[in-house]
Amino acid sequence: VLEELLQRGHAVTALARNPGKYVARPGLAVVHADVLDAAQVAAAVRGHDAVVSAYNPGWGEADIHALFLRGSGAIVDGVKAAGVQRLLVVGGAGSLYVAPGVQLVDTAGFPAEYKQGALAAREALTRIRTESTLEWTFLSPPALLVPGARSGRYRLGSEELLMDGER
């Protein structure tokens, strides 16, 4: 997400617990902030046009479910406190429907190592749907995203999982 924003010429402020992990580049400002703290989020994003959140505490995090919900909630609260109106949240494919009334995260084949994070992302989506003071968008990337050459094409769906070969 960061790379795409920079390549498209956006000025980006990245919030990081460890700013030293980022390489200095044009258009990128790295701010030390803990996204679990709404006040720190608010201070970091105040004056921005929009916030793009790709928060995930890490798939290997033992308490990913609770941390994901705490962090996503603090981000929403911080964005609102800062007076930023636009929030784009990068979620996951788990909340997409694969059949009427069946979301991907609820299928038997959903990988166990991603289940708690996907359940938390779905809960975060449920929470943000009740938000009436922000202009928000929840983005669900593909279920499987692998490196490769840009095709210059993409497909948009709504709440259903898109698979290769479907038009």
What are these regions (language model features)?
Residues 15, 54, 139:
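The conserved SAM/SAH-binding core of class I Rossmann-like methyltransferase domains
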Residues 153-167:
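A conserved pocket-lining segment of Rossmann-fold NAD(P)-dependent short-chain dehydrogenase/reductase
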Residues 126-147:
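Conserved beta-loop-beta element that borders a ligand/cofactor-binding pocket
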Residues 60, 94-99, 144-148:
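Conserved catalytic-site region of short-chain dehydrogenase/reductase
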Residues 20-81:
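NAD(P)H-binding glycine-rich loop region in Rossmannoid oxidoreductase-like domains
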Residues 1-10:
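N-terminal Rossmann NAD(P)H-binding glycine-rich loop of SDR-like oxidoreductase domains
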